[in-house]
From Swiss-Prot:
This is Splicing regulatory small protein. Interacts with the splicing factor SRSF3 and increases its binding to specific exons within pre-mRNA, thereby regulating exon-inclusion during alternative splicing. Does not directly bind pre-mRNA and could regulate a wider range of splicing factors through a similar mechanism. It comes from Homo sapiens. It comes from the Eukaryota. It is found in: Nucleus. Its main location: nucleus. Residues 1-29, 74-130 are annotated as: Disordered.
Length: 130
């Protein structure tokens, strides 16, 4: 029984990543550049809804030109995180430092701290343990 040669699947994302396993791409001998180019020609012949089809060549250009292929181009196409909402931003780390500083300054030597709750659990009352 003869098997047909595998053609590239039509269900690929516009970043050139195959929907199946990456092993399938290696088996057929396709490179990321060829996948992106075949996808590029496929999408140019079938226009998409709205104005996305006018921007599609500029979106695919990093995929075709970049040596690492779609993985790095996908990261490059992601929108930059807003510095005010980014959890690793400078503003958030400053706020954590201020909070830590306040916690240390508020707790004096004579002020009982939060370890009161764990001590009551350590006393061993069977009603609180599960």
């Amino acid at each position: 029984m003869r098997t047909k040669p595998q053609r590239p699947r039509a269900t690929r994302s516009y970043l050139g990543q195959p929907c199946g396993s990456p092993r399938r791409t290696e088996e057929t001998g396709e490179t990321w550049e060829r996948v992106a180019f075949s996808l590029f020609t496929h999408t140019c012949t079938q226009p998409l809804a709205g104005t996305v089809d006018t921007h599609l060549p500029s979106l695919l250009l990093p995929v075709i030109l970049h040596p690492l292929g779609a993985a790095s181009a996908g990261r490059a196409l992601e929108p930059k995180a807003d510095p005010h909402t980014c959890p690793y931003g400078r503003k958030e780390s400053r706020g954590e430092k201020v909070r830590r500083g306040r916690a240390k300054s508020n707790s004096g030597p004579n002020v009982p701290g939060p370890p009161a709750a764990p001590q009551s659990l350590k006393s061993g009352s069977p009603s609180t343990r599960r």
